[in-house]
A protein has these predicted regions:
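Intrinsically disordered, low-complexity terminal tails/loops enriched in metal-binding residues
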Residues: 1-183
Length: 183
């Protein structure tokens, strides 16, 4: 009786887990993608004064990438409300610089950079306030020559879960919430 039960259970399991041909009509390996690429790069950097969290379009040579840069004071975990920010993308010995004098809202600076070289880059932020000048580097950013490849890579490294609860940087500024670099 136990043997019959086990065989019945195993057959139900294997038939329910089967993949039926034609049930998936999205040709992911072909070149006919009708979906939009919305994945963003999530970049984080720290120093003793600031945390920088940036949401960036994947970087592609010859195309403008928009970077929404969130800057947080580490002493109180509140947004940088004023100050000048310079972003420098260094790739292959070439530097691409973008300066912003004011945030679009407290703590958020919109930056646009168009790299002309591919390779691995470093994004350096120079943050100038009335009282201090500070630098933060974020290394290991890939610049692609192909838009499709750049977006596919960004999608591949974006965590996916059906049980996601988003907690934005803006929300963290409104409550007593702090982050800390792992040591």
């Amino acid at each position: 009786m136990k043997k019959l039960f086990f065989i019945l259970l195993a057959s139900i399991f294997f038939t329910s887990c089967g993949h039926k041909e034609g049930a998936h009509n999205h040709d992911h390996h072909g070149h006919h993608h009708d979906h939009e690429h919305n994945a963003k790069l999530h970049l984080t950097g720290y120093n003793d004064i600031f945390e920088v969290y940036a949401e960036a379009d994947p970087f592609v040579t010859g195309q403008e990438s928009t970077i929404l840069t969130h800057i947080t004071w580490l002493n109180n975990f509140k947004p940088l409300s004023s100050g000048k920010v310079t972003a420098i993308l260094n790739v292959g010995g070439k530097q691409y610089t973008y300066k912003v004098d004011l945030p679009i809202q407290a703590g958020i600076y919109r930056i646009a950079i168009t790299p002309k070289e591919s390779g691995t880059a470093t994004l350096t932020y120079q943050i100038e306030t009335r009282d201090t000048t500070s630098t933060i580097e974020i290394k290991g950013i890939d610049i692609y020559t192909n838009e499709h490849e750049a977006h596919e890579m960004a999608e591949a490294i974006t965590p996916k879960s059906i049980n996601v609860i988003n907690f934005t940087k803006e929300q963290s500024w409104d409550v007593d919430f702090a982050t800390e670099q792992a040591k």
